Amino acid sequence: TFRTKGEGGCMEATLSQYRDLLMDAIDSGYIDIVDVEYFSDMEIVDEVIAEAHSKGVYVIVSNHDFKTTIPMEQIVDRFKSIIFTGADIAKIAMMPEEGSQVVDMMQAAKELQECGNQTPLIVISMGELGVETRTTGEMYGNTVSFATAGIPSAPGQISVDALRSQLTMIHHIIAGK
């Protein structure tokens, strides 16, 4: 993953630098999965996906908003648009301003799951408000979570040990154990 400054990363990159970096990573033969930002440029997104798939590399198409969370219907539409690119995994991470926006993120994933979506989703509400999206994903169709083994790389990340404990507890509740 190379996260551009526009989506919360630390470094600026021109579109051609961003494209070249991703293509070099794909062509290196050393990666299994690459993350391409949905709003970088559709031509680049399409090109990266095609190259990655031709080399047997999986693709996460992602969108990050560190300022706010869009309404639930727009989250669903954005996920559908990301899925339509041919992404192997669709990811949206947004910053909630209130608890109802966290619920919107989870409900959007659940709605897609109930409509038969087969593309794995990564659904994250960042910050302290959004911690539950990192721990209860199994309940609403989130397939991946992120934790920290040290310094968090995004707001709201919890330690690996805390996440493991929470995921185990939620799984046992769902499984009726």
List where the protein language model places each region.
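Catalytic alpha/beta core domains of metabolic enzymes, predominantly
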Residues: Y38-K177
